[in-house]
Regions:
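N-terminal transmembrane-helix/juxtamembrane module of multi-pass inner/ER membrane proteins
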Residues: 1-38, 51, 67-95
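Structural signal for the C-terminal ends of transmembrane alpha-helices
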Residues: 18, 43-50, 116, 162
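Hydrophobic alpha-helical transmembrane segments of polytopic
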Residues: 27-30, 56, 60, 124-127
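Alpha-helical transmembrane segments of integral membrane proteins
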Residues: 37, 51-59, 120-123, 144-148
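Interfacial segments of alpha-helical transmembrane regions
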Residues: 41-66
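Alpha-helical membrane-inserting segments
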Residues: 42, 62, 66, 70, ...
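Transmembrane helix-loop junctions in multipass membrane proteins, especially transporters and channels
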Residues: 47-50, 75-80, 139-144, 161
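Membrane-embedded catalytic cores of phosphoryl/pyrophosphoryl-handling enzymes
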Residues: 84-162
């Protein structure tokens, strides 16, 4: 992604204040989806699928901690740091761009849902991809950050499904 690419991709959003507001709302709503779906998964697994509960309680947090350490070690700059752009989404600080923790977390949560309710699981993985697009358009992630975050989230989630 170049500054020119970013300008071209975001021009329609910049020209329409409601579209920019929708981007902000989508970022917030899709992020909150993960905060809602993981605890709900744990409650429902407690009630109906105890083996899934223990896998989700172990694999997801361990994967998240390992993932966070990987991000901190790589400490890649964000697009607004490396390019001369005005990001549509505000974020304090810099670095730790690669891979996207939002894409990773939501795709991992979606994969955890598959054994309990596949439609919710797949819808959540799709929501993770959509959140990735929102964060790229927001100027706070590179496309590769999102792609790797999704791939690693799905891969770690497979450990819950197996």
């Amino acid at each position: 992604m170049t500054a020119g690419d970013y300008a071209r991709w975001t021009a329609p959003l910049r020209a329409r204040p409601r579209a920019r507001a929708a981007l902000f709302c989508a970022n917030r709503a899709l992020t909150l989806l993960g905060y809602t779906l993981y605890p709900l998964l744990l409650v429902l697994a407690w009630l109906w699928a105890r083996p899934l509960l223990w896998r989700a309680l172990v694999v997801a947090p361990v994967a998240f901690v390992a993932f966070s350490h990987l991000r901190a070690r790589i400490d890649a700059p964000r697009p607004y740091e490396a390019l001369d752009i005005d990001p549509l989404l505000a974020r304090k600080g810099g670095g730790v761009s690669f891979p996207s923790r939002h894409a990773f977390s939501l795709s991992l949560i979606g994969m955890c849902w598959l054994p309990l309710c596949a439609p919710v699981g797949w819808a959540t993985v799709v929501a993770a991809a959509l959140l990735g697009v929102v964060r790229v358009l927001g100027g706070i992630h590179w496309p590769r950050d999102v792609a790797w975050g999704l791939a690693l989230g799905v891969a770690c989630g497979l450990l819950v499904c197996l």
